[in-house]
Amino acid sequence: INTGINDTSYYWNELSRCVNLYCDLKKICPELDSLNIGGGLPIKTALSFDYDYEYMIEEIVSQIKTICTRENVKEPHIFTEFGSYTVGEASAVLYSVLQQKRQNDRELWNMIDSSFMTTLPDTWAMNQQFIILAVNNWDREYERVFLGGLTCDSHDYYNSEANLNAVFLPKITCDTPCEEGQEGDVQYIGLFNTGAYQEAVGGYGGVQHCLTPAPKHIIITKDEDGELVTKLFAKEQSYKSMLKILGY
């Protein structure tokens, strides 16, 4: 059901049609015993996200059982494909702000040290929204900004207008690129719940758009005492690695 699982009349009507079709097929083929309702269970893409998972799952199961009982058909084994829900919260992407530039009287751009098109391709392809938070400098005043990537492509930016969600981040105090330890040092930002599709679509280990290097990959787990443990999975891609792939 291509709308995703939402508490709307359209979704419930489509689910009802799906289950009724299963019942019709079950009467023709008694060996049929399973129903795949697909994916579409949403994940948190904004801090304001509010979704009653327990209610929705219980209601889906209840409606399937009700229709099958009415049609005198044994209820099926239910299969789902909740990919985004399963893996979405497993990843985050961290960027640093290289520099800030004023485009005009209204647009203040924070330029990140990577590319949205290569690391989070859904932001470019379908204006996907993700949770954006400042990693440091929470004690500073904040300002509305736009986020741009490093590539030469005019589409390499986070489209906050399409998401109707302005981006507010701590004020940048450096006129030139900041360095660690400098007054108003490097501003880091994180985009969270990025575990679904992004790396699979963007690719891993190859050559990216505009030769943007693949970022460093770090795995964060907890030990038996509940303490966070980090492990380097892959270093940031080097120019030598990219040139070797290209045959130089």
Give the location of each predicted region.
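Active-site loop/helix belt of alpha/beta enzymes
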Residues: I1-R106
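Charged (often Lys/Glu-rich) extended helix/loop segments that serve as interaction or gating elements
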Residues: E59, K65, T69, V73-Y248
